[in-house]
Amino acid sequence: MKRNILFNRGKLLLPSLVAGIGFWKFMKARYEANPDYIVHFIKKYAESKDISLFIHHNDEKIAEVNSTVQLPLASTVKIIMAIEYAQQAAEGLMDPDQKVQIADIEKFYIPKTDGGAHEAWLSQVGTSGNVPLCEVVNGMIAYSSNANTDYLMNLLGLDSINSVPKSLGIPNHEPLYPISASLFIPSTLMKEKNFTRKETLHAIEKMEMAEYRSWALAINERWKSKPPTEQEKKEATKLLSLDFQKIWSDRLSRATTKDYVSIMKILNNKMDLDQHVHEHLDPIMEQLMKNPSNRKWLLHAGQKGGSTAFVLTVAMYATDRDGNRTELALFSNNLSSMNQEKLTRSLNDFQLQILTNPKFRDFIKENFAIS
């Protein structure tokens, strides 16, 4: 039986500033899927602490590399958002069917900053009128729309969202903060402080994380009464050269693969969260189960990934129809464009091998000295 996993990862990069189409085609032709590549890559870069892997299979540790090192999560952090939405929906605090105006979401949309995620979502739901709240959440997870994410942050409340990790037994997860608004920090500093580009870069580089988050929150608050104009959005993105993108990427909320495997276990066992929560959460998180081929051999499975120009992350869980349970988290940072492309192309096959091939799991344990 052919077994399929569709790896849908959300991009948080500005692709037009990272690589040209011709270069991408070159890499597409050159780098084919190779699950062994991920193993060799992790072994090569493990000492740098820029790569982290944690895998459990039927409660057995298959691999653990830098599992307590905090790394930027990119869009994988949206799992926390989905959990808070499901909890509020289960408690009757949110109505999944309530109508949300597309125009209210668009104020948070910054063109060319999410790899086309938001536009892809809009192509499905339309660009005018309204959609049910559950579809906004679906757009955040299935398409990885940052605009949907920031809209939901304001709706659900950041205090409630940031209480989720602790409620799941994860005390050191860094706080979430508005993604789109943080992209406006450089242009806002330049205007309000009358900084040059160089002065702005220096100011953000030395800024403490608490202050950085405060700027993002303040910008987000302003947008509630005065959304950014299209011209302001163009000016903000024009400033986001690769050096600004790197600072932004490094300052995204961080956590560990050990943290996220713990969360994946909670989502996988279907016992720790109230069943009413799962009624709202599973249709959002388990996009993989929309594929009929996956339903033939998987009981349930979910995942969320993310990337920037420098980061690639994924967290997933699965239980197959024989009752085998797998939880996996892989986080990486400071990637070259070539390494990121090779990892991305190999990740789906790597996950499939972990889920279905005992010999590959033994190979993983041997390479990472898990006895």
Label each region the model flagged.
Residues 91-100, 139-144, 179-183, 192-195, ...:
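Noncatalytic linker/hinge segments flanking ATPase motor cores
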Residues 26-80, 84-190:
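Active-site-adjacent loops and short helices of periplasmic peptidoglycan-processing enzymes
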Residues 50, 143-259, 263:
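Mid-domain, small-residue-enriched loop/turn segments at the edges of structured enzyme/sensor domains
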Residues 89-95, 130-144, 187-205, 209-223, ...:
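Hydrophobic transmembrane alpha-helix bundles
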Residues 16-21:
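Hydrophobic core of alpha-helical transmembrane segments in multi-pass integral membrane proteins
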Residues 53-61, 103-109, 140, 214-222, ...:
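Short low-complexity stretches enriched in small and charged residues
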Residues 4-15, 27-42, 62, 222-371:
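Structured C-terminal helix/loop/strand segments within mature extracytoplasmic catalytic/sensor domains
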